[in-house]
């Protein structure tokens, strides 16, 4: 399937209706997975179908939880998503008991024509068991290393950790993300007082800014052959009444924003704004 169609409409992010085995201290979704009794994959499918009728060419993001925690269910989800969407998967890239990195790669590569990118979480500090980096050589689709920088950017130790991290993934596409819990409408687009932006600028070559959206922005850098994007996004996506991200929760219920910021989606909110 071709992937060169334009994105039209807000991103639909689906929280997979099954848990992960991680316990990352910064995870804001873990509490929602403590009780899975109301989770329903079929209702999630119905929600995906409804959103596809409204926005047949938007981005669909699978997150969690851990999408790769149940590879069978993940394949069912990928099979269900209609053609015409860019599909992204957020994962820590676990390799289950009795599996190899080749097993995982073989399953995901079956969807190489459907997957636009897999964002693989790696951090300056190890929070989860990481599979060997060699897995990235096995994939037949785009991957991106995703790192939320929680450490103090003014600390010299953070600088050393970041350089070591960038060297580890030299040649890969990398996305460094600001700690969204500190971002507001007043500072999300600010770089003058952004210590992490300054640190990245010191150790990488600045290239250009990404186009600003209502609730997020980004800046592109380069270092030793790696494209490095510094991404800043608010912890909420609905600004001035305009829905930026649509959330399908594990129950199949559809919300207009993230976590405690979100309310059940009012379809009428989607027709009052001209999405591009």
Locate the predicted segments by residue:
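Core AdoMet radical
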Residues: 11, 29-42, 54-70, 84-100, ...
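Canonical Radical SAM [4Fe-4S] cluster-binding loop centered on the CxxxCxxC motif
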Residues: 1-44
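Regulatory, intrinsically disordered low-complexity regions in eukaryotic nuclear proteins
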Residues: 31, 242-243
């Amino acid at each position: 399937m071709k992937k060169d169609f334009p994105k039209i409409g807000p991103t639909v992010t689906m929280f997979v209706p099954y848990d992960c085995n991680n316990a990352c201290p910064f995870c804001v979704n873990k509490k929602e997975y403590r009780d899975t009794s109301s989770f329903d994959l079929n209702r999630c499918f119905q929600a995906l179908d409804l959103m596809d009728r409204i926005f047949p060419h938007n981005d669909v993001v699978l997150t969690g939880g851990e999408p790769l925690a149940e590879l069978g269910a993940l394949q069912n989800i990928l099979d269900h998503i209609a053609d015409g969407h860019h599909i992204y998967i957020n994962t820590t890239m676990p390799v289950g008991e009795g599996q190899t990195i080749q097993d995982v790669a073989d399953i995901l590569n079956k969807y190489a024509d459907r997957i636009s990118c897999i964002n693989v979480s790696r951090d300056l500090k190890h929070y989860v068991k990481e599979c060997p980096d060699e897995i990235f050589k096995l994939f037949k689709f785009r991957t991106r290393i995703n790192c939320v920088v929680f450490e103090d950017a003014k600390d010299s130790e953070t600088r050393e950790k970041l350089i070591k991290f960038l060297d580890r993934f030299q040649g890969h596409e990398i996305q460094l993300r600001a700690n969204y819990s500190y971002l507001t409408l007043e500072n999300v687009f600010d770089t003058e007082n952004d210590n992490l932006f300054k640190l990245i600028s010191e150790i990488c070559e600045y290239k250009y800014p990404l186009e600003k959206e209502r609730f997020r922005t980004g800046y592109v850098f380069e270092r030793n052959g790696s494209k490095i994007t510094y991404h800043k996004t608010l912890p909420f996506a609905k600004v001035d009444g305009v829905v930026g991200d649509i959330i399908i929760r594990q129950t199949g219920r559809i919300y207009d924003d993230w976590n405690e910021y979100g309310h059940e989606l009012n379809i009428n909110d989607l027709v009052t704004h001209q999405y591009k």
